[in-house]
Structure formats: structure tokens, C-alpha cells
């Protein structure tokens, strides 16, 4: 979920908001593996499915994508410089739930934990809000993800 996305629509208009969502979707797809699925779920929420991925690696991917979103300046080709942050929730099959409804519910709960505290972070089902990766964790996660 994108933090304060309504402000983008209110400030720049819904067309710019739609362009931002489209660019965001493209960036998410580009930064996932070929077997992964990244799609807009509704409003300013995206879902990313990571088949054959452990919860630990899913958390690594979530943190990496979180960093990508918060550090990117969006819509520069349109002459805009939009910065936005995400609130991210992670749930894993079969560790957290064995149903798609359960996974979405738990990922939503984790995301709302972030939204209701400090925003701009990642939380995982049954683990709470997660610290940012250190450089060593980044390197280990990159190696594991390949």
C-alpha cells in the first residue's frame, strides 16, 4: 500500500495518480523473477506472489522492493519529481496460512500494523514490524535470491 497516495491525486490530479500506479506496477514486475506475479490489487495496493520462496526470502524481497519504491523519484519523464513510501505486509504459505484468503488477510494485517504505527516500513505475519537490512543482510539476501 502506498503511503499518502491520496495526496498525489489531490495535488497533481487523478491522471498523474494513475500514471504513478502504472509506473509502480512496471517497476515491481521488472524487479521480480519470471516466476513471480506482481499486480495491482485495488486502489493503491499491490500484491506480489513469490512461488517457491521461503518466508525469509520473501521478507528479503519485500525489504528490497520497499527500498526501491522509497528511493525512486517517480514520473520524472512527465516533469514531476514524486517521492512516495510504501507500507508492506508479508505472509507466507504454508507457514502463516494454507489458504489464499488467509494469506491476504494476514498480509493485510501486517500492512495495517505498519500503517497504524510509523508507515514506510515492512511487517510480516507473526513477526511484526521488521528492521531495515544491514549491508551484510543485503549481500546474504542477494546471494540467496539467485
Model-derived regions: residue spans:
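Heptad-repeat coiled-coil signal-transmission/dimerization helices
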Residues: 21, 25-28, 62-63, 104
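PAS and PAS-like sensory/regulatory domains
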Residues: 84-86
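Conserved metal-coordinating catalytic motifs of nucleotidyl cyclase and c-di-GMP turnover enzymes
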Residues: 1, 43, 107
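Residue-level recognition of strand-loop junctions within catalytic nucleotide-signaling folds
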Residues: 10, 50-53, 70, 93-94
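Active-site loop/short helix in cyclic nucleotide turnover domains
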Residues: 2-16, 28, 32, 45, ...
Amino acid at each position: 500500500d502506498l503511503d499518502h497516495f491520496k495526496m498525489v491525486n489531490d495535488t497533481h490530479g487523478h491522471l498523474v495518480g494513475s500514471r504513478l500506479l502504472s509506473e509502480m506496477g512496471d517497476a515491481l514486475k521488472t524487479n521480480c523473477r519470471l516466476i513471480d506475479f506482481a499486480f495491482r490489487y485495488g486502489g493503491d495496493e499491490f500484491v506480489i506472489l513469490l512461488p517457491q520462496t521461503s518466508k525469509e526470502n520473501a521478507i528479503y524481497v519485500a525489504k528490497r522492493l520497499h527500498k526501491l519504491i522509497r528511493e525512486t523519484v517517480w514520473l520524472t519523464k512527465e516533469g514531476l519529481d514524486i517521492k512516495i513510501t510504501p507500507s508492506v505486509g508479508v505472509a507466507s504459505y504454508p507457514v502463516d496460512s494454507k489458504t489464499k484468503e488467509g494469506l491476504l488477510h494476514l498480509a493485510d494485517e501486517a500492512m495495517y500494523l505498519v500503517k497504524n504505527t510509523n508507515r514506510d516500513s515492512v511487517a510480516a505475519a507473526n513477526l511484526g514490524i521488521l528492521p531495515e537490512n544491514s549491508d551484510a543482510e543485503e549481500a546474504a539476501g542477494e546471494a540467496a535470491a539467485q
